Amino acid sequence: YPPADAGGSDSFTEADFTAHVEHLKKKLPSDDFTIVVQKPFVVIGDEPADDVREHSVRTVKWAVDKLKQEYFSKDPNEILDIWLFKNATSYERNAQLLFGDKPTTPYGYYSSTHKALVMNISTGGGTLVHEIVHPFIEANFPNCPPWLNEGLGSLYEQTGELQGRIHGFTNWRLPGLQAAITL
């Protein structure tokens, strides 16, 4: 793989992505997985292939395009994997099998150590968009404080598009934030 300081995945070649996919194929837990290159990520999922492709375009590509339009000039520093598991059972089993992780959230998480976004996609795409923010923050604002990194991700926990721009809508995190502010 190219070194981490190669200048972001926008500098990675087709050959880099092809080699990455070939490496991934060797570690797939079963033949039930579909792999889609959706630059700057590689999306891997155990839902039907059409569903994985739809998530890669309608959520991953859309979020990447809109977030870059608003905030980010550089892609993540490495080729990262987005693992989309079809349900809680698959998510928990495969997070353990692939990464030795026991998820602390039912939705998903970003692991910079494993260069992976790990999702229970049955809970929706909100957490996926939230987690996509983190590797972009790392690449574009390496000294960003954790509260801002999480805050920006949380803003996009429920997203849509207004006037061609990404828009974060009120989501389940607001009551907790309001309670913390009033303490």
Predicted segment positions?
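Juxtacatalytic substrate-recognition/specificity segment
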Residues: T13, H20, S30-N149, T159-L162, ...
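Pan-zinc metallopeptidase signature
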Residues: E22-L24, L183
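Flexible, glycine-rich surface segments
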Residues: N149-L183
